[in-house]
Amino acid sequence: FFSYFDELENETIHGHVYSSAIGGNTANSEYELLTGDSCAFLPTGSVAYQTYINYPVGTLVSTLKDQGYSASLLHPHWSTGWNRIQVYGLFGFDRTLWRESYRAVDTLRGYTTDEWDYEKLIELYEEERAAQADDEGVFIFNITMQNHGGYGYNSFRETVHISGHE
């Protein structure tokens, strides 16, 4: 498994991303990644999507679309959060898929599971790829939900035990 990651590291362009949004306000992390701008200097508690995005701005989305990529968003939670519908339209996404885009999802602690999300991500990629010419690329921005709070939820089964550390 790790040899695959080692190979990816040797064969791809990669780096590190730092986000000034830690422990909440997920939309600010998205904003920083997609725009390259920092939220560190915004007023405390502000969310860029709700306050500052009122017109089209240059983003990773627009840059990739200028290079012939399709641009889709997959977010398996409700579309009503953080003014995302308006913002992602202004960012230039061709297609946005939300929790309400699907009849049923698999959940854990009330949130869509990563497994379900990744299966849909693969389906979306294959669908987008089939619709593209060979020289066109596919960009899909995927926001997962399973890692959101509620960690004390009583539906977890302890399946891994380490001797001497009970």
Ranges and model annotations:
Residues F1-E166:
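Solvent-exposed soluble domains appended to multi-pass membrane proteins
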